[in-house]
């Protein structure tokens, strides 16, 4: 399977730097990168999607066409921007913004009906990890049970919560074992990504694991040269 690199800017990228980054990345890449390289700016960092060399996505959207949803972006906004790729279930939205499994299912079903490419994020906390692989499997199974795993436009991203933004990536053995379990659980044709303190030093080794189909990269991707380095490993 072709490897994938995704950049998640979260809320850390200045608006105009984001715009410049997207334009420069478009110049750097080639058409064959379009289905392999994804960028998720925040809302103000988005541009109308005329990019041919990578896929532009959004970090979040509300599961309605439009309406009285103060502060939210909806499918009509995304349609106007020609964006049809979306992150759902990132741990920061689950934990900090209290998005429940039922609400995540509502989002998933809504954007599935719109035929969006969905990147669905899962991952356990440190307390669960310390209980062992059996507890991790049970936790991840519960996170996946509400969504249609046969949806053809689905990508799953495994991001252990304890490794996000901490500088402490999961060990290669942890990734190998967890991805091995997930690959057995998921459709074999579905891309399965790893995220959690990915950087230019560990990306190549992680991509070398057969069950890792790509990377979801946070803070390291904020510098274009770092992201280009990781893309070169694909």
Swiss-Prot record:
Pfam families named in the record: TIM (PF00121)
Similarity annotation: Belongs to the triosephosphate isomerase family.
Biological role: Involved in the gluconeogenesis. Catalyzes stereospecifically the conversion of dihydroxyacetone phosphate (DHAP) to D-glyceraldehyde-3-phosphate (G3P).
Cellular localisation: Cytoplasm
Subunit record text: Homodimer.
Amino acids binding substrate: 8-10, 165, 197
Gene3D superfamilies xrefs: Aldolase class I
Pathway participation: Carbohydrate biosynthesis; gluconeogenesis; Carbohydrate degradation; glycolysis; D-glyceraldehyde 3-phosphate from glycerone phosphate: step 1/1
Entry GO MF terms: triose-phosphate isomerase activity
Main subcellular localisation: cytoplasm
Descriptive protein name: Triosephosphate isomerase
Gene designation: tpiA
EC number: 5.3.1.1
Reaction catalyzed: D-glyceraldehyde 3-phosphate = dihydroxyacetone phosphate
């Amino acid at each position: 399977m072709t490897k994938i690199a995704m950049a998640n800017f979260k809320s850390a990228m200045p608006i105009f730097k984001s715009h410049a980054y997207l334009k420069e990345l478009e110049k750097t890449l080639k058409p064959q990168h379009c289905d392999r390289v994804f960028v998720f700016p925040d809302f103000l960092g988005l541009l109308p999607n005329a990019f041919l060399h990578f896929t532009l996505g959004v970090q979040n959207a509300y599961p309605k066409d439009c309406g009285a949803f103060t502060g939210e972006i909806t499918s009509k906004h995304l349609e106007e921007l020609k964006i049809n790729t979306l992150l759902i279930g990132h741990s920061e939205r689950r934990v900090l913004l209290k998005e429940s499994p039922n609400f995540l299912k509502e989002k998933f079903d809504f954007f599935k009906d719109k035929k969006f490419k969905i990147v669905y994020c899962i991952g356990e906390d440190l307390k669960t990890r310390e209980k062992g692989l059996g507890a991790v499997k049970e936790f991840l199974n519960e996170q996946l049970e509400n969504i249609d795993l046969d949806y053809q436009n689905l990508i799953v991203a495994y991001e252990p919560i304890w490794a996000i933004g901490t500088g402490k990536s999961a060990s290669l053995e942890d990734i190998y074992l967890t991805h091995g379990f997930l690959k057995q659980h998921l459709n074999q044709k579905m891309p399965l990504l790893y995220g959690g303190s990915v950087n230019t030093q560990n990306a190549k080794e992680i991509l070398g694991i057969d069950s890792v189909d790509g990377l979801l990269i946070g803070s390291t991707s904020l510098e274009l040269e770092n992201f280009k380095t990781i893309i070169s490993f694909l």
